[in-house]
Structures are given as C-alpha cells and as structure tokens.
C-alpha cells in the first residue's frame, strides 16, 4: 500500500499491486480494464473510477450541496454569496487537481510510458482462487508453489497464443472460457456462469505465470530459440506431445499430470544431460546451439 497524507491530517491508503484490492475492487477493475486495452476507455478514466471506488469519494453530492447553499446565500446575503462562489471555484480547482494527481498515481493495473500501456501481470496468487472451486494456484512469496499440472500449463499457453489469431470479441470470449475451463477443471458449458471480469482476470494472471518462466534465469531457456529458429531440444517450444515423449523415454511417467515445477525441472535436466553428452563427445558449443536451438550462452553455462 502507498500511504498519502491528506490536508486534514488523515491518511489515504492506495494499492500498489493487485493483491491489495478487495474482491469487489478487483472485479470492478477487471470489468473496466479490457476496455482500456481495446482503446475504448482512457487509462485516466480507469484510474479515476478506481480512485473514487477505493476512497469512497462522491463529488456529485458535494457539488449539489454547494449549489443549494450558494442559491440560499444569493437570497439572504448576495455579497457573501459572491465571495462563496469564488471560494468554491478555487476549492473545486484544488480538489480537481488533487484528484487528478491521486488518480494518476494508481499504477497497480498498468503503467503509462507516453501512449504505451504496460499491463501489470504480477500476482502473488490466483486472485480468483477463493471464488472458483479446484482453481489452479501459483503462489509467489518466499518460494514458488503451484498445484498446476504440466497439461494445464501447456494447454493454457496454446490458448493464449490463439488469442492473437482473431480480434473479434466473440472469439476472445470463447478462448477465455476455454482457458478458464482448463485452469479451473470445469467443462466449457460450466464457464458460462463465470463473470467476464473473472475470465479476463484469469487470462491476465496466467499471462503472469507464463511471464515468470520466460524471464526466469534457468527456465527461460525453455522458451528461447536461437536465431536459426529451431526448437530447443526437450524444451517447451517442441509442443506437449514431443516433450512428453522425450521425458517418458528418459524414464518419467504420467508426464501430463506432473506438477508444473517438476515438469520444468525435468525438461531442464533433460537438456543439461543432452548438452553434457554432446560436449563429452567433442561437439563444440556452437554446434550444440545450432542443433538444439539454444543460445550459445545457455550452452556454455551447461558445459
């Protein structure tokens, strides 16, 4: 939370990450954010609406009260009414300026770099885990823990990739429902009862899970390819079927149902074993990189 001292001495607490929102605030944010992403809502409008919800500030009621009071003063004391009108104008400008600054400081959902919108995909856990039974979890605290399976992750990655193939709202909703079905162990028909905020928010959270592995100093090699464009041997880029086959040939069983972290570790071990074997046979690092699709830097780290 970000603490801001107000003029009256009270402290305003503004969230700086997704996990600091209440359930109601989270759903409201996930309702509006797709419109921001689609360019149908200004980022500042999102920030202002969330600020008003978080603070409970209701500007319309205050303006109405002041207009009524000023009308009463015009009837009883015109001179004071004129002074009050100017005071209200200055107060309104001050309040508006403060609202703008506070709203623009809300960055739990995204950051703005000029006109570029950078979404925040970081969640300490699935924000909807308490709303949906049998939800996939991915907890990031002192250590990372998950109940997600290799199959759930792989299918989820494929579905996220499909989102880019069609821009129509109907297609996006279809893919988001399929993704939620995978991650919440639901049938496709059962996802019809999930709010749009949960569907979109689930995709945002899962994108953060994928991002975690892509940016990880070790697991990241499973997603990287060399400039030659070939797939990394034993890596995630091969596709689920080939990865399962490779791991099962190496002695692993029921790979699709493996815990996601165990699945990732198994792939890393398989790659390291293959690289070590090639190096022992005298194959140069550059040749290993060319064959496997790994970068030379990744190969050198494993030799």
Spans of features found by a protein language model:
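An amphipathic, hydrophobic-aromatic interaction surface with interspersed Lys/Arg
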Residues: 1-286, 296-302
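The alpha-helix within a helix-turn-helix
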Residues: 289
